[in-house]
Structures are given as C-alpha cells and as structure tokens.
C-alpha cells in the first residue's frame, strides 16, 4: 500500500544519510 511505499522511501533516505555520515567519519 501507500504506507509501505512511504516506509520504503524513508528507509532508503535513512540509509543514504547513514552512508554520508560514515563517509565523513572516515576522514
């Protein structure tokens, strides 16, 4: 449903932000 799609999009956004944060932590 729409809720599931929204949750999936939010999870992707969170994962992307975590990737950026980890990249910065390595420097």
From Swiss-Prot:
Record localization: Secreted, Extracellular space
Keywords from the named record: Copper, Oxygen transport, Secreted, Transport
GO CC terms in record: extracellular region
Transmembrane intervals: none
The keyword Flavoprotein is assigned to this record: no
Keyword Secreted found: yes
Free-text tissue specificity from the UniProt record: Hemolymph.
Superkingdom, natural source: Eukaryota
GO molecular function, one term: oxygen carrier activity
Family to which this protein belongs: Belongs to the tyrosinase family. Hemocyanin subfamily.
Protein role: Hemocyanins are copper-containing oxygen carriers occurring freely dissolved in the hemolymph of many mollusks and arthropods.
Name under which the protein is recorded: Hemocyanin subunit 5
Organism listed in the record: Homarus americanus (American lobster)
């Amino acid at each position: 449903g729409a809720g599931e799609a929204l949750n999936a999009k939010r999870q992707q956004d969170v994962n992307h932000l975590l990737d950026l944060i980890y990249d910065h932590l390595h420097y």
